[in-house]
Amino acid sequence: MEEFQRYIELDRSWQHNFFYPLIFQEYIYGFAYDHGLNKSILLENAGHKKYSLLIVKRLITRMYQQNHLLLSANHSNQNDFFGHKHKNYLYYQIISEGFAVITEIPFSLLLISSLEAKEKKIAKSHNLRSIHSIFPFFEDKFLHLNYVLKILIPYPIHLEILVQTLRYWVKDASSLHLLRFFLYEYRNWNSLITPQKSISIFSKKNQRLFLFLYNFHVCEYESIFVFLCNQSSHLRSTSFGALLERIYFYGKLEYLVKVKTFTKDFRLILWPFKDPFLHYVRYRGKSILASKGTSLLMYKWKYYLINFWQCHFSLWSQPRRIYINRLSKHSLDFMSFFSSVRLNSSVVRSQMVENSFLIDNPIKKFDTIVRIIPLVGSLAKAKFCNVLGHPVSKSVWTDLLDSDIIDRFGRICRNLSHYYSGSSRKKSLYRIKYILRLSCARTLARKHKSTVRAFLKRLGSEFLEEFFTEEEKVLSLILPRNSSISRGLYRGPLWYLDIICIHDLANDE
């Protein structure tokens, strides 16, 4: 990022808040290649992994020579965006990746400056980057809560909403026009946002740009929503000058001058929602609002959120997209886990002089279970098994080397084991390992035109080692499997703080 700042400081266009000229700079595409989600588009030869500066130079030259970016939607049907149909997709990919880097510039630098200013006050915690850090939070907080709102965040009904949201941060009109061009000219290529799936919404062709737009959209909503939650929880009188500067934030507030009046009005609006135990968690398009309050309070929050989205963000959300769950009776489906709070009885025998009696102490425990049916469905969709969970051979991999086939199956198995290690019941996970192990054996047997039994007999125990995680290997060397300590480590939940995404097979949302 320091190198990125050095380039930007030398560029006069950035000094005047003009982002559009940056799209003609070669180093922008270099950063897009280094940090983009789809790195293959700037590779001249994917086998050699070499960055093709020639493609970028040719693209910039074409943009200088002709007004390609001013073509209307009528011309896009003729596939003459850059003169050739097969180059159209490649050049669009490169520009969208570069434009994504450009739009991230003001927010990245703003974040760095804010962190540097507060470096002495804020404790740096890299562990909070892991999505597994959510579950220890659940274990600490959910035991004392009663209800949960499971929220599917609504998607923008019109792409212009995304542009309008961004224009309050990006003052360069040319860049915003270019963004509109990307969204409207290519919205038929696996559209930006689809209502069928809540957050499996991004075209894999433009992930960086679309992820940035959606995350920025959600961040804008959350910045206001978290402010409302703080007001309802603590009703503190603090300064909210940054929010007052935004035109679209509560239009009636433009006539308010004093922060006291601003805070007073929100106290009147939110007094029915007062709750000192309110917790908010989000991952992708799903969020959770947990409270210790009553069901009436949760219904108030539900319909307040619906009106809040519709009135102030032009987002249509139906009541059925927000579910109210009582933790003591219903499981919570979140991040490919079934989570619930269950009561365990602990009977203690007490002896007092000559009298003895039993004391039954109910203890709450946070329980997480692997969602086996959707996971088997994902394996079936990937052709590792049939819909009933019976392993089958992966025919498309039979052309690979034996070591590559075993490595691929083993990597998938280790990734799933790593992610689902926090499950309190691991029997379902053993079934997934069995499916992958036998599917691998059948794939190898099909390749060598042999039987599974004969192939397993020839490979021996070395074949199974690929399907063990590193933790299981270490534990098997240190502790015998029949010891009580080893059984506790194998069966107990184990959350990792280095997981930043859900494995593709685990992500069925």
Curated annotation (Swiss-Prot):
Keywords of this entry: Chloroplast, mRNA processing, Plastid, RNA-binding, tRNA processing
Gene Ontology terms, MF aspect: RNA binding
GO BP annotations listed: mRNA processing; RNA splicing; tRNA processing
Keyword Plastid: yes
Membrane-spanning residues: none
InterPro entries xrefs: Domain_X, Maturase_MatK, Maturase_MatK_N
Pfam families: Intron_maturas2, MatK_N
Primary localisation category: plastid
Any one cellular-component term (Gene Ontology): chloroplast
Domain of life of the source: Eukaryota
Subcellular location: Plastid, Chloroplast
Functional note: Usually encoded in the trnK tRNA gene intron. Probably assists in splicing its own and other chloroplast group II introns.
PANTHER family: MATURASE K
Family: Belongs to the intron maturase 2 family. MatK subfamily.
Descriptive protein name: Maturase K
